[in-house]
Structure formats: C-alpha cells, structure tokens
C-alpha cells in the first residue's frame, strides 16, 4: 500500500487538486467547535495557543482559495468548514473570535490570505457572507492599518 500523497505525480491540475484535498481533509476533525481554530498539537510558537490555532486555520486557505477560484468541486466540503470558521473568527461575540491584534502580531501576516481570497474568489469569500460578517471581516482586517509590522516578508 503506497502513500497517496507521495505517489501522486503532480503533473496535472487534477493531481494538484487531489493532493491539496488529501492534505487538508484530515484537518477537518481537528477544527474547533465553531471551526475558527485548528489545533495541530503543541507547538514551539512564541505566541499564545489561540494565535497558533488561528495561524493553523489560515494556512490551508492558501490552497482552498485557488481551488475556489478554479471552481474545483472537491473543495466544496473543505470550504464549507472554513467558511463557517471565518464567520466565527471575525465575530467579536464568538468565543473563537480571532481577537484584537497588537504591533508585530502573528495574526497580521495571516491576514494576507484573506486579501487573496477576496481578490481571487470574491463571491465565495466575501459577497456570500452575511452583511454583518462582511462588516466584521472588514473591521478585523482593517486593524492591520493601525499596527507596526517588521520590515521583512510580512510586508509583501
């Protein structure tokens, strides 16, 4: 029995799509109850667990967003979970709210994928959100304009 990811030749669009799903699907049971955080275990991060879990939630979006933009059918079950997580994560009244950021905050760098989502898949990533959530997403992302960031790869 081979390793389905290792044995994937990654030669075609469908190969890459299949690999992304194979890597992200096992994360679904690790999502928090409101799906705004992803607990991958204990980390060596120098920031609190809730921020590490928000980071873990955001990283798969780098694959999910292009799949949404490319209208890949296989992304739908993944997107349903991440869509629910975004709604919870930007809601200040939700216990899984991603919170108020501070200068040099890890969550600032994670905001980039949300911009990519709105640019590449605006319908799914923004316009399909409830109006209240659109405003909350804007407010949460807008925090970046009021905080310092290191002069490194965070400032794309």
What are these regions (language model features)?
Residues 53-54, 64-66, 75, 79-156:
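Aromatic-lined, polymer-binding surfaces characteristic
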Residues 1-55, 77-85:
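Low-complexity, Ser/Thr/Pro/Gly-enriched N-terminal "stalk/linker" regions
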């Amino acid at each position: 029995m081979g390793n389905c990811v290792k044995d994937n030749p990654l030669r075609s669009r469908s190969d890459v799509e299949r690999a992304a799903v194979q890597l992200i699907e096992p994360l679904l049971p690790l999502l928090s109850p409101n799906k705004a955080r992803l607990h991958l275990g204990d980390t060596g991060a120098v920031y609190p667990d809730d921020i590490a879990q928000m980071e873990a939630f955001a990283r798969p979006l780098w694959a999910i967003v292009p799949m949404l933009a490319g209208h890949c059918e296989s992304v739908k079950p993944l997107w349903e979970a991440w869509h629910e997580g975004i709604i919870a994560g930007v809601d200040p009244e939700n216990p899984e709210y991603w919170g108020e950021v501070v200068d040099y905050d890890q969550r600032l760098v994670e905001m980039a994928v949300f911009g990519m989502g709105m640019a590449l898949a605006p319908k799914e990533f923004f316009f399909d959100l409830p109006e209240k959530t659109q405003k909350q997403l804007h407010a949460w992302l807008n925090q970046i304009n009021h905080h310092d960031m290191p002069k490194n790869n965070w400032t794309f």
